[in-house]
Structure formats: structure tokens, C-alpha cells
Amino acid sequence: MSESSSKSSQPLASKQEKDGTEKRGRGRPRKQPPVSPGTALVGSQKEPSEVPTPKRPRGRPKGSKNKGAAKTRKATTAPGRKPRGRPKKLEKEEEEGISQESSEEEQ
């Protein structure tokens, strides 16, 4: 019994070693670490003075979904300033406007 358990543990150890060194080929390959300048060839080196521009993010930023409520402010007009845009109707004015329209139709 002890012999069979020791035999089974040996193949498992060899499998783990193979997995560590052997590439599986699934998914995206890992990014290779940058090569140190000492090992790189002199002819293929880029100029150190050249600084690449950082990539700008595309599209909508991630955290901008639910910020509409925080940015909105009340539409209060300061005294002496005219309100911009179309004036808002109050509930009373709406009711009066409807009653005036119906009375105009009768006449």
C-alpha cells in the first residue's frame, strides 16, 4: 500500500514541473518583461532623449455614468438678471391657458 502511494506522488510531481515549463497555449500570451539596455544591441537601441507621448483614453471615462444629479443646480435667477431660454409655465398659468383656449373657441 505504501509503495503505491509513493508511486502516485512521483508522477504528480513530474506533472507539476512540466506545467511550469511547458506552455499550454490557451488565452492571451503573457507580456514579456522589458529587456535591460545592457543586453540589447547598440544598433537597435532607441534614443534616450525621445519621450513617447502617453496614450489618451478613448471614449467615455469609467466613472462618469451617474454624475448628472451632482452637477445639476437649481434654476434660481439672481435679481437683475434675465432668465435664459424658454420661460417655464407654472401650474396656475397652465390651467388659465387651458380655460382661455376653451372660452375662445366658444366665442
UniProtKB/Swiss-Prot annotation:
At which residues is the DNA-binding region annotated? 21-31, 53-63, 78-89
GO BP annotations of the record are: negative regulation of cell population proliferation; negative regulation of DNA-templated transcription; oncogene-induced cell senescence; positive regulation of DNA-templated transcription
Q: How does it assemble?
A: Interacts with HIPK2.
Lineage of source species: Eukaryota, Metazoa, Chordata, Craniata, Vertebrata
Is DNA-binding a UniProt keyword of this protein? yes
Name positions with the PTM Phosphoserine: S9, S36, S44, S49, S99, S102, S103
Bias (Basic and acidic residues): 15-24
PANTHER family, from UniProt? Answer: HIGH MOBILITY GROUP PROTEIN HMG-I_HMG-Y, HIGH MOBILITY GROUP PROTEINS HMG-A AND C
Could you tell me one molecular function GO term of this UniProt entry? transcription coactivator activity
Q: Among its keywords, does the record have Nuclease?
A: no
Could you tell me what this protein is called? High mobility group protein HMG-I/HMG-Y
Modified residue N6-acetyllysine is at which positions?
K7, K15
Location of the region described as Interaction with HIPK2 in the Swiss-Prot/TrEMBL record: 53-77
- The ranges of region (Disordered) come to 1-107
Covalent link Glycyl lysine isopeptide (Lys-Gly) (interchain with G-Cter in SUMO2), residues: K15
Q: Mark the residues carrying the PTM ADP-ribosylserine.
A: S8, S9
Acidic residues composition bias: which ranges?
A: 93-107
Name positions with the PTM Phosphothreonine. T39, T53
Q: Name one GO cellular component term.
A: nucleus
The record's subcellular locations are: Nucleus; Chromosome
Q: Which family does it belong to?
A: Belongs to the HMGA family.
Which modifications occur after translation, per UniProt?
Answer: Isoforms HMG-I and HMG-Y can be phosphorylated by HIPK2. Phosphorylation may modulate DNA-binding affinity. Methylation at Arg-58 is mutually exclusive with methylation at Arg-60.
Protein keywords: Acetylation, ADP-ribosylation, Chromosome, DNA-binding, Isopeptide bond, Methylation, Nucleus, Phosphoprotein, Repeat, Transcription, Transcription regulation, Ubl conjugation
Main location, first listed in the record: nucleus
In UniProt terms, what function does this protein have? HMG-I/Y bind preferentially to the minor groove of A+T rich regions in double-stranded DNA. It is suggested that these proteins could function in nucleosome phasing and in the 3'-end processing of mRNA transcripts. They are also involved in the transcription regulation of genes containing, or in close proximity to A+T-rich regions.
- Write down which residues bear the modification named Omega-N-methylarginine: R26, R58, R60
Q: Which residues carry this modification: N-acetylserine?
A: S2
Organism, by scientific name, is: Cricetulus griseus (Chinese hamster)
